[in-house]
Amino acid sequence: MLHNRETTLQLTKLSDSAFAQLAPSFTKLPNTEHADGKFRLRRYSVIQFKDGQVIDLQKNEFMQTDDINRFQGNVVRQFEPIETPTLQSEGMREICQLFADANKLADGQEIEIHQMRISAIFDETQVAPEGVHQDGFEHIALIGMGRHNIEGGDVMLYSSFNEAPFFRKVLQNGEVAMLADNKLWHNATPIRSVIELSLIHI
């Protein structure tokens, strides 16, 4: 079935230098006061990608309607912005260029970036509390940025909300899955710690 997915699913990988540059910033993500804020640590920024450059638009509020997000729909969520050195890094520019080229985005396209780390604070921690879902965009990218002391967290993709997943994979360091969010649904398996009382995150 994957031969029918050329335009809806693309798999690639960041350069080793981009991963090495970006990965340390994921250890400095803040908790939030939102419903998932104790285990989904996050920064969020909206940028414009123009002439190959990342331009910070200083937008840090995010909302999804409840028909898209059954967990936190119709809630305006304010997040701390992605730190300037990270946002202006060559690694972030590489991500945006990759995303723009793969999806044939117009020059100057706005791109919303969620920088997130998920900690296994429960026996089983839900990576995606909303379950099988879409995010409300035409295109999205999921990028693996490191795993420590966890199992689970497999990305699962679906052709429709009620079908079994046709794709399942743990995204390893720097691996990128780009998908047509308006055509596919996604979810992830829960994560759990391998060694208790040790630092855990994905």
Put a short name on every predicted segment.
Residues 109-114, 119-172:
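Catalytic core of non-heme Fe(II) oxygenases with the double-stranded beta-helix
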Residues 1-114, 121-124, 160-170, 189-190, ...:
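Fe(II)/2-oxoglutarate oxygenase catalytic core
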Residues 200-202:
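Conserved small/polar residues in nucleotide/adenosyl-binding loops
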Residues 155, 188-189:
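Short amphipathic alpha-helical leader/targeting segments
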Residues 170-185:
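Conserved metal-binding segment of the jelly-roll/cupin
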Residues 46, 140-142, 176-178:
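Conserved hydrophobic/aromatic beta-strand scaffold that supports enzyme active sites
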Residues 148-151, 176-180, 191-194:
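Low-complexity, flexible helical/coil segments
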Residues 39, 105, 133, 147-149, ...:
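A generic structural signal for short, solvent-exposed coil/turn residues
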